[in-house]
């Protein structure tokens, strides 16, 4: 009798533990954004004012960056501060250190920057994607991100919903889905699900 109860218990535990973890609810993400709003806005400010081009930060491949190890015992007395601090995508070392701290505070490991500049209009368009939750593999899984994109509503084929939790919507549809939910002027939650 005890063996059958233990076997049943183990079977239930293994089935329950096989389900993918639930992404954070929209409400949890909105509260998180509100708590760390100043940090999110500072990330945008740094990227808008100091960065160049479209890129991932921190860089995903070591070839994209030259980092001088401050603990290295080499003679750099002949180098100027500019030579010791080579910009990475236009970001100087103080900006990078601040970004590292801000990304840690908001719980996002990286930021994807899409920067577009128009010479004729002297204007810059910057959008950000900051992955917050991810489960699965490259071509099949679920992710939720914080997005800053002031022009998102004007794009075609973008699904923005203001009602219901994105998790529940994609579970009902259960097919490849990309949905956005507004958080605050230009800021969104993005849910990406693919099977």
Question: Model-derived features: where do they sit?
Answer:
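Extracytoplasmic electrostatic interaction patches
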Residues: 93, 104-195
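Bacterial N-terminal signal peptides
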Residues: 7-15
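Positively charged n-region of N-terminal signal peptides that target proteins for export
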Residues: 1-4
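Alpha-helical context
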Residues: 9, 19-23, 164-166
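Short, flexible coil/linker elements and helix-boundary hinge sites characteristic
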Residues: 14-17, 107
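N-terminal export/targeting and maturation segments
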Residues: 18-103
């Amino acid at each position: 009798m005890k063996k059958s109860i233990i076997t049943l218990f183990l079977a239930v535990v293994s089935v329950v533990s096989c389900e993918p973890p639930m992404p954070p609810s929209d409400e949890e993400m909105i509260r998180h954004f509100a708590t760390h709003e100043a940090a999110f806005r500072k990330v945008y400010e740094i990227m808008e004012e100091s960065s160049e081009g479209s890129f991932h930060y921190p860089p995903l491949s070591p070839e994209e960056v030259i980092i001088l190890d401050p603990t290295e015992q080499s003679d750099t007395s002949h180098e100027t501060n500019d030579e010791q601090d080579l910009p990475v995508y236009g970001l100087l070392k103080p900006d990078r250190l601040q970004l590292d701290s801000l990304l840690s505070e908001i719980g996002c490991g990286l930021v994807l920057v899409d920067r577009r500049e128009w010479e004729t209009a002297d204007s810059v368009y910057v959008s950000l994607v900051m992955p917050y939750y991810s489960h699965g593999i490259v071509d099949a899984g679920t992710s939720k991100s914080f997005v800053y994109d002031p022009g998102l509503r004007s794009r075609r084929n973008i699904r923005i919903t203001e009602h219901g939790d994105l998790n529940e919507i994609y579970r009902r549809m259960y097919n490849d889905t990309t949905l956005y939910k507004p958080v605050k002027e230009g800021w969104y939650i993005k849910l990406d699900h693919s099977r």
